[in-house]
Curated annotation (Swiss-Prot):
Pathway: Cell wall biogenesis; peptidoglycan biosynthesis. It comes from Orientia tsutsugamushi (strain Boryong) (Rickettsia tsutsugamushi). It catalyses: di-trans,octa-cis-undecaprenyl diphospho-N-acetyl-alpha-D-muramoyl-L-alanyl-D-glutamyl-meso-2,6-diaminopimeloyl-D-alanyl-D-alanine + UDP-N-acetyl-alpha-D-glucosamine = di-trans,octa-cis-undecaprenyl diphospho-[N-acetyl-alpha-D-glucosaminyl-(1->4)]-N-acetyl-alpha-D-muramoyl-L-alanyl-D-glutamyl-meso-2,6-diaminopimeloyl-D-alanyl-D-alanine + UDP + H(+). UDP-N-acetyl-alpha-D-glucosamine binds at T11, G12, G13, N122, R165, S189, Q291. Its EC number is 2.4.1.227. GO terms for cellular component: plasma membrane. Pfam families: Glyco_tran_28_C, Glyco_transf_28. The keyword Phosphoprotein does not apply. It is found in: Cell inner membrane. Cell wall formation. Catalyzes the transfer of a GlcNAc subunit on undecaprenyl-pyrophosphoryl-MurNAc-pentapeptide (lipid intermediate I) to form undecaprenyl-pyrophosphoryl-MurNAc-(pentapeptide)GlcNAc (lipid intermediate II). This is UDP-N-acetylglucosamine--N-acetylmuramyl-(pentapeptide) pyrophosphoryl-undecaprenol N-acetylglucosamine transferase. One of its GO terms (molecular function) is undecaprenyldiphospho-muramoylpentapeptide beta-N-acetylglucosaminyltransferase activity. InterPro entries: GlcNAc_MurG, Glyco_trans_28_C, GlycoTrans_28_N.
C-alpha cells in the first residue's frame, strides 16, 4: 500500500481540503498520513479520521530578538522532524495545501527526491506555494485565473477546485418561500469579531421593520464574544444558536436560507458544494487580499454578493438581508448558479495523485 503525505497548516482553510482529499484517497486504497501544526490541532477534535496524523510545533517568525531566535530554532527542529517523517515513512507522493508548515516536509521531499503536488485554494497563489513552484510536479488550483502564478509554470497548472469533506458533499433542498427564515453567520475556522456587532445591529433594524418572517440566527462568533452576541439576540427576542465552532456545520448550512460569511478558501468551497446563497464580507487584511478576489469570483458569477468591510454598515447589511428575504426567486437563482459552479474536486485531485504516484 503506497503512502501519501498530505500537509497543510495555520488555518482550517489549509487543513480541511487535505482531510477531504485524505478521505477520497483512503477509498482508493492509499495509506494516508496527514501532517499539520498545533494551530490546527483544535479543528481535529470530535472528528474521527482513520488515517495517521502528525502535529508539528510550528511558530511564526517574529521581528524581535529572542522571539526571532526561538522561531528559527523551532523551524530547524521542524526540518529535523520532517526528515524523520519522510525517511521513516517513505511516502510515494506529497500533496501540500499551503501554510508555512509545508516547508519542512517539502524540503525533505526534495532531498529524498519524492515528487510533490501543490494545491492552492485561493484565487491568489500563497507565498509558501510560490516558494516551491519550480520543483512541483503539478500546481492544482481552485480558480483558472489564479493570480501570482509565474507564466513559466503555467504548463504545470491543473484546475481541480478545492476538495470538501464527505459530510459537506450534498445539495440541500431549501424552501426559499418559507416564512421561517434561517440566517447563518460564519467567520471561517477562526471566527470574525466584526460580525459580533455588525450582524446583531443589522438584525435589530430588521426586527423593527414591518415583515411577517420568523427569523432564526445561527452565529459562529469569536469565543470571547459569545455571551455578548447571545445577549443581543435574546434582547431582540430572536431564536438563536451561538458557538465559536460548529462541528456539525453541514446541518447548519442545510437548514439556512442565507449566509453571512468571510471569503476564505474553505468557506468558498463549502458554499459552492452546498449551494449556499451568501453575503460575502472579505477579510480586508488577508494575505495579498485573496479573500476579496475569492468573493469577486463568486459575485461575478452571480452566485453570491460581495460587500467590502470598509463600506458595510449595519444599515447596509440590514437592507441587503431584508431585500433577499423578500426575493425567494433571486435566492433560488443564486442557488442554481452555485450548482453550476460545483465540480467533484476530491475526485479530480485524487486523479492527479494517481497520475504522479511513484510506481
Amino acid at each position: 500500500m503506497k503512502t501519501i503525505f498530505l500537509v497543510g497548516g495555520g488555518t482550517g482553510g489549509h487543513l480541511f481540503p487535505a482531510i477531504a482529499l485524505g478521505e477520497e484517497l483512503q477509498e482508493r486504497g492509499y495509506n494516508v498520513y496527514l501532517i499539520t501544526d498545533t494551530r490546527c490541532e483544535k479543528y481535529l477534535l470530535n472528528f474521527n479520521y482513520s488515517f495517521k496524523i502528525h502535529i508539528m510545533n510550528m511558530v511564526s517568525i517574529s521581528n524581535t530578538g529572542i522571539k526571532k531566535l526561538y522561531a528559527y530554532i523551532r523551524i530547524l527542529a521542524a526540518c529535523i522532524t520532517g526528515f524523520k517523517l519522510v525517511y521513516s515513512n517513505s511516502p510515494s507522493l506529497i500533496v501540500a495545501f499551503g501554510g508555512y508548515t509545508i516547508a519542512p516536509i517539502i524540503i525533505n521531499g526534495i532531498l529524498f527526491r519524492i515528487p510533490f503536488i501543490l494545491h492552492e485554494q485561493n484565487s491568489v497563489l500563497g507565498l509558501a506555494n510560490r516558494l516551491f513552484l519550480r520543483y512541483a510536479k503539478a500546481i492544482t488550483v481552485t480558480f483558472a485565473n489564479t493570480l501570482n502564478l509565474n507564466n513559466r509554470y503555467k504548463h504545470k497548472v491543473i484546475v481541480t477546485g478545492t476538495p470538501v469533506r464527505k459530510a459537506l458533499r450534498f445539495t440541500p433542498k431549501r424552501n426559499f418561500n418559507s416564512k421561517n427564515f434561517q440566517l447563518l453567520v460564519i467567520g471561517g475556522s477562526q471566527g470574525t469579531k466584526i460580525f459580533s456587532t455588525l450582524v446583531p445591529n443589522a438584525i435589530k433594524l430588521l426586527v423593527n421593520c414591518d415583515h411577517d418572517f420568523k427569523i432564526t440566527i445561527v452565529h459562529q462568533a469569536v469565543a470571547k464574544d459569545i455571551n455578548y452576541v447571545k445577549a443581543m439576540y435574546t434582547e431582540l427576542n430572536i431564536e438563536h444558536e451561538v458557538s465559536d465552532f460548529f462541528y456539525n456545520i453541514a446541518d447548519k448550512y442545510k437548514n439556512s436560507h442565507l449566509a453571512i460569511c468571510r471569503a476564505g478558501a474553505s468557506t468558498i468551497s463549502e458554499i459552492i458544494s452546498l449551494c449556499q446563497p451568501a453575503i460575502l464580507v472579505p477579510y480586508p487584511v488577508s494575505a495579498q487580499n485573496h479573500q476579496l478576489f475569492n468573493a469577486k469570483a463568486i459575485a461575478d458569477n452571480k452566485a453570491g454578493w460581495c460587500i467590502e468591510q470598509s463600506t458595510i454598515t449595519p444599515h447596509i447589511l440590514f437592507e441587503k438581508i431584508f431585500t433577499l428575504m423578500q426575493s425567494p426567486t433571486l435566492l433560488a437563482s443564486t442557488e442554481l448558479k452555485l450548482r453550476e459552479m460545483k465540480i467533484n474536486a476530491e475526485n479530480l485531485l485524487a486523479n492527479v495523485v494517481d497520475k504522479f504516484i511513484v510506481t
